[in-house]
């Protein structure tokens, strides 16, 4: 039965109120994605004459089938979002039913194309990207960000979260960096990673211009002056794509780069350099060998040579 306007308002009010309980337990990006997923689900139910909460197994299956144009990862996340709201509202949860699992498996099997992976910013690309940075404060910051992100195999959110306090300048001109929190480390136990001498030099040059008195390692620059706040993680994506474009790469290649490219490219380079899986997992903070394998799929590494 289609809920009326009053019921829809009550549903929206109830779930959004309960949803706030998740704050602090999940990353902000995950919260935003779940929130958008539930909005989509509620609107779909309204248009389909169905009740969203509690949703029946039939309703959730029908919703998932309607979402089959999206990537399986997106559909799976929407299942998790629906599950979480049912749990928060103390309602019977339909998402553990076997029919839900079978519906998702059908959607996943219907996808014949391989999941798209960000183009790796390998060392050869890194060298090109560093070479096209301007000779000004923005260039100092950009070079330090690109080189540090590559050496630490960071996600973009990890890179912009680093503080000056997290960086130890070593006598051999390298850096020891504490990455405090990551997507797979919500508890914030952190991991330690190391850099090359080149990265140590680039970070030092950036800080000598900016000063050591700000907490964020990387910060915005406004009218030639550093601003004491962290950069948005979208800055990393824009930086990499802009560097690829300025380096004269093919537009299709430019489009394939993303904020994840540093992590992908560095992992591929470590594989080609002969490092074993355990060493690569430690360097990048991977907990799952299956996830790492996805990163290494496109590495140009011929084991027969």
Describe each model-derived feature in a short phrase.
Residues 126, 141-143, 233, 237, ...:
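Short, leucine-enriched amphipathic alpha-helices that occur as contiguous helical runs
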Residues 149-173, 282:
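Short, charged phosphate-coordinating catalytic segments
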Residues 284-305:
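Catalytic-site neighborhood detector that most strongly recognizes the C-terminal catalytic loop/helix
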Residues 212-213, 237-264, 268-282, 301:
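Short, basic (Lys/Arg/His-rich) helix/loop patches that form interaction surfaces
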Residues 124-156:
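Basic, Lys/Arg- and aromatic-enriched nucleic-acid-binding interface segment
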Residues 15-31, 38-116, 132-135:
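N-terminal core-binding DNA-recognition domain of tyrosine recombinases/integrases
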Residues 170-226, 239-243, 247:
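Basic, alpha-helical nucleic-acid-contacting "clamp/cap" segments
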Residues 109-128, 186-198, 212-217, 229-234:
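DNA breakage-rejoining catalytic core of tyrosine-based enzymes
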